[in-house]
Amino acid sequence: MASPSSFTYCCPPSSSPIWSEPLYSLRPEHARERLQDDSVETVTSIEQAKVEEKIQEVFSSYKFNHLVPRLVLQREKHFHYLKRGLRQLTDAYECLDASRPWLCYWILHSLELLDEPIPQMVATDVCQFLELCQSPEGGFGGGPGQYPHLAPTYAAVNALCIIGTEEAYDVINREKLLQYLYSLKQPDGSFLMHDGGEVDVRSAYCAASVASLTNIITPDLFEGTAEWIARCQNWEGGIGGVPGMEAHGGYTFCGLAALVILKKERSLNLKSLLQWVTSRQMRFEGGFQGRCNKLVDGCYSFWQAGLLPLLHRALHAQGDPALSMSRWMFHQQALQEYILMCCQCPTGGLLDKPGKSRDFYHTCYCLSGLSIAQHFGSGAMLHDVVLGVPENALQPTHPVYNIGPDKVIQATMHFLQKPVPGFEEHEDEASAEPATD
């Protein structure tokens, strides 16, 4: 095992000027955005008012302490929090014993966004650990010796692609992984999360993500999957876990991202979906809620905001003339303010909302959402909107896979050099059969 000192904090340069525009949340009229319950209190409205009060305290502290121009991403503190997490966890994480590949992914992706390199010895240790989590049946379990499950399989493949070395790629048993995906496929096009487990949109996304990254998609593996996902879109415009259920940010992201991978985005009512997701950004807090009438949560900075690049791409492909060519269809500045002011733990790590504890899950998805809010487009269309000091800028993340775009390209190029397991061999056998009259 590598010692923690094998990590070296890389402090970015600090020569650029600070952001000088006024903050959205500190406008004199911003209080008008608070909840108006028309004197009819409900459990929901009471909880919303409590959250708004805590967030107002945070906004006020910035205003009265003259810290307005000093919105700073506490990079070094987050880096040290993440570095420790790869080596040692407190007993509070005992409940995540079946999610250990997720911890690897959340931490590695957070470091990737912060542009912190992974030392070779640490990368090797992660590869060896994830190899222990791989099941002989295919796929990865939540820990060594545990049953395989699509969620930790997704996390493990993403973590290995972030490392991006031959050693990491070689951990993945593609033949067994394909067999495992087939074993979970259902006649209606959906996938089980694990043998004997539940079906929902997450499993379709996890399957599509790992299959596309590792080049194991066969002609019939996702037959009927796009149609099943489309049936999960409900009257609200968002996507539920299964057909007929309430729209939810996490399920909606999984559904649309899976359809992007399968090139079937048009299976959805995209305008209805756009209306639903843009309505989930909270007017007062600036962050996103996961469902209608729920509270703001930092993790939806990615699950909801990450939908907007996917929708932008899909609507652009349809020739929508109303699309901006310089910004996403949500308030990017307001989201950055919420994350930077309300979601940073003073000792490192990020959190759901003021008053909550930090964890690696929220650290990963708050940083991922911050990256989405900072970067529009790519190449000639790139337009950055970085709030606060210039050093707040994060590395971009791929809106479909939520790992670095360069890591997606590197992994797909690597695995495209390998045949789809069992597929080319089957084609060769078919072509070798003698012709019959």
UniProtKB/Swiss-Prot annotation:
GO biological process: lipid metabolic process; protein farnesylation
UniProt: (2E,6E)-farnesyl diphosphate binding residues: 248-251, 291-294, 300-303
Annotated PFTB repeat ranges: 123-164, 174-215, 222-263, 270-312, 332-374
Cofactor, how bound (note): Binds 1 zinc ion per subunit.
Entry keyword set: Lipid metabolism, Metal-binding, Phosphoprotein, Prenyltransferase, Repeat, Transferase, Zinc
Reactions catalysed, as given in the entry: L-cysteinyl-[protein] + (2E,6E)-farnesyl diphosphate = S-(2E,6E)-farnesyl-L-cysteinyl-[protein] + diphosphate
Keyword Lipid metabolism: yes
EC number: 2.5.1.58
Cofactor: Zn(2+)
Residue numbers binding Zn(2+): 297, 299, 362
GO molecular function: protein farnesyltransferase activity; zinc ion binding
Modified residues (Phosphothreonine): 436
Subunit-level organization: Heterodimer of FNTA and FNTB.
Task performed by this protein: Essential subunit of the farnesyltransferase complex. Catalyzes the transfer of a farnesyl moiety from farnesyl diphosphate to a cysteine at the fourth position from the C-terminus of several proteins having the C-terminal sequence Cys-aliphatic-aliphatic-X.
Similarity comment: family membership: Belongs to the protein prenyltransferase subunit beta family.
Protein name: Protein farnesyltransferase subunit beta
Classification lineage: Eukaryota, Metazoa, Chordata, Craniata, Vertebrata
